[in-house]
A protein has these predicted regions:
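Signal-transmission/dimerization alpha-helices at domain junctions
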Residues: 21, 54-57
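Heme-based O2/NO sensor domains and their adjacent alpha-helical segments
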Residues: 1-31
Length: 225
């Protein structure tokens, strides 16, 4: 009855999303994997945690959806790693060398980004529409047609993580003014109190969760099989 109650409470679609995320998180990199996949899941866990906390603070009505969206937003990275390992390795090397965002290096090397490949996987696996929208548009939230607040919420926290030691394994060398980001404008239109948001305190909270996230990813990937 407890499981049945949980399913009824969350809804079938949400349970499908959660089950899918669990499957993704148990994917282990092969021995000859050209990059450390755990780095990307550290970023995804951090983004999920921060997105949920941020959602709670600004009054977004569904913090659980924010967590799941943060967790899944970069699944296209795993797709690119599976399908185009050599090309993706070249892209990540270029991103490291140039200190540019990964999606820019992917576009230059692969001709597509993890946003497009992630969208294809999400559609094939029939993830919820809002998750597909986040996966496709989290680097350009202004291009989202639906669920814009959720897309923008994940976009902001993705940037926060990438600027604070929980990115894609390297430091991106460009300055970010969150108040000038399209994602911030989208959120501000819906949550006016965001003008008073304490960014310094929120950044401090992110720093305090770095070790927690790293321990969680280690547990997932290094637990006895």
């Amino acid at each position: 009855e407890t499981v049945r109650g949980a399913v009824l409470s969350l809804g079938i679609r949400r349970m499908q999303d959660i089950a899918m995320s669990c499957c993704l998180l148990k994917l282990s990199p092969s021995a000859d994997c050209p990059v450390d996949v755990t780095v990307f899941w550290e970023h995804s866990f951090a983004c999920a945690l921060l997105a949920q906390r941020f959602a709670q603070k600004i009054g977004y009505p569904n913090p659980e959806a924010a967590y799941l969206a943060g967790l899944l937003h970069d699944i296209g990275i795993i797709v690119n790693l599976w399908m185009l390992p050599e090309e993706f390795s070249a892209a990540i090397n270029q991103a490291h060398a140039s200190h540019v965002p990964l999606h820019e290096a992917e576009l230059d090397v692969l001709g597509l980004t993890h946003c497009e490949s992630g969208e294809l996987l999400a559609e094939r696996w029939k993830l919820a529409p809002e998750m597909i929208e986040v996966i496709r548009h989290h680097h350009h939230p202004e291009s989202a047609r639906e669920y814009r607040a959720l897309v923008a919420l994940v976009a902001v926290n993705d940037l926060m993580c990438r600027m604070r030691r929980l990115g894609h394994g390297y430091q991106e060398e460009y300055l970010i003014d969150f108040l000038e980001q399209p994602a911030f404008a989208i959120l501000l239109a819906e949550f006016p109190n965001l003008k008073k948001f304490d960014w310094a305190r929120f950044t401090f909270e992110l720093e305090s969760h770095v070790e927690e996230v790293q321990q969680l990813v280690t547990l997932v990937y290094k637990a006895p099989k």
